[in-house]
Amino acid sequence: MPVWKLIKYASLLIIVVTLPAACGTSKTLTVASTATLLEDVAKASFKQSDLKLVREGMPSYLMLIDGMVEAVPENKQLLITAAQSYASYASGFIQDEDKAYALTLYAKARSYALRALEQNGFKNPLSRPFDDFEDGLQKMAQKDLPYLFWAASCWGGWISLNQGSMEAMAELPRVVAMMKRVLELDEAFYYGGAHLFMGILEASTPRIAGGDLNLARAHFLKAIELGEGKFLMAKVYFADYYAKKAFDRELFIATLEDVLGTPADIEVELTLLNSVAHSKARKLIAEADDYF
């Protein structure tokens, strides 16, 4: 079913959900059906290559998912889907042109992701003492990976756009600890996403503050390897964060040209993200003279 039809059908179900229910069981079934449908919309969107279509449809989808969370606020799968959706919209379509709005979107993603983490059993991630926080991470297992990874990813995205806030930066050690736990549990999870995060972190941190460019390179290359070269955003970030920092124009251009030479649908479920990677790669190449 096309994305726009899925959204239209989901809209009708949202209306039903929010009307006073004569039968509690009926409402529960409708909520469950809509939650499943919204996940289907997300999956269908990630197979799209039409960035304009997805960009224009996302605000409606986000409003729908907000309505669903309002109806079933303790559904952890719905919460994590909402977090992923807000973070993906911010990073893929908004961040490069409107950082203030992207920060607002990431704040929503962070809120949903932390709520999902709590519903999954990890209580008070913001306020519990750090030693207790780390002990809690050690109790998390493979089954907890989606909640752990996406909470850390959304939280980290919010911090990256909020670096002027000392309070936000003080939360970074918690995110790093979460990503390190992801690496311990399964370094290949989400195309080596934790390695990608650590690569960006090491490359972005000044050497005087402990950043290690060689370690950043190792993390980026491991992420690319674990994604079998199909997750093109890993290569875009490698060029943007490592090659630029290393002042290696040849590597910068070669990496981005490799991205553009790889079909977006090399992995169907990554078509949208790879199309975004193509767009970002073209922009970075056009701006190369500004960096080197």
What are these model-predicted stretches?
Residues 10-20:
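Bacterial N-terminal signal peptides
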Residues 36-67, 71-74, 78, 85-184, ...:
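Short coil/linker segments at helix-helix boundaries
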Residues 187-188:
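Membrane-interfacial loop-to-helix junctions in multi-pass transporters
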Residues 5, 20, 53-55:
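A short, ordered amphipathic alpha-helix with a cationic face
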Residues 286-292:
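Extracytoplasmic and endomembrane cell-envelope/extracellular-matrix remodeling and assembly machinery
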Residues 19-45:
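Bacterial Sec signal peptide processing site at the extreme N-terminus
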Residues 227-228, 285:
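Domain-scale activation on soluble regions of proteins
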Residues 2-11:
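Bacterial N-terminal signal peptides that target proteins for export
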